[in-house]
Amino acid sequence: MTRYMLDTNIASHVIKGDIPEIRERLVSVPMHNVVISSVTQAELLYGLAKRSYPKGLSVRVHEFLIRVDILPWNHDAATVYGDLRARCEAAGITLSPLDMMIAAHASAADAILVTRDKAFSRIPEGLRIENW
């Protein structure tokens, strides 16, 4: 089974429905193969908390979080994070701390990270990426 982990930006586009190509690709994949990291969940909820969004968007975020499988941050993800961060620092590669955590979580979960963020492509080998 191929598992796809949506990063925060892709999850936001899914919720907003503003990029048809993402929606088309998403509906072609069984929902039980689509996951997000608990880090992405936290980022989505933070985004709602810091701004006064219309109630409709808040409802859509919560509906999305009910429907998608959310993988908890665990020991395996933390182990991969430590190794990945050390390798990136040694190679002079910088990524935001939360992006680094999401990348590590996708690797630990043996998932393909779905992203449109080119920063993830700088990560040394081991992270599988798809741009939807």
PLM feature spans:
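Active-site neighborhoods of divalent-metal-dependent phosphate/nucleic-acid chemistry enzymes
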Residues: 68-114
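A generic structural signal for short hydrophobic patches within well-formed alpha-helices
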Residues: 11, 41-44, 78, 120
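Acidic, PIN/NYN-like endoribonuclease modules and their adjacent C-terminal/linker elements
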Residues: 1-3, 103, 107-132
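Generic structural signal for small/hydrophobic residues in well-ordered secondary structure
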Residues: 7-8, 22, 44, 81, ...
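Short, well-structured N-terminal submotif of metal-dependent ribonuclease cores
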Residues: 1-36, 48-65
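Histidine- and aromatic-rich ligand-binding microenvironments
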Residues: 7, 37, 94-96, 117
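Amphipathic alpha-helical recognition patches that constitute DNA-binding helices
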Residues: 21, 35, 60, 76, ...
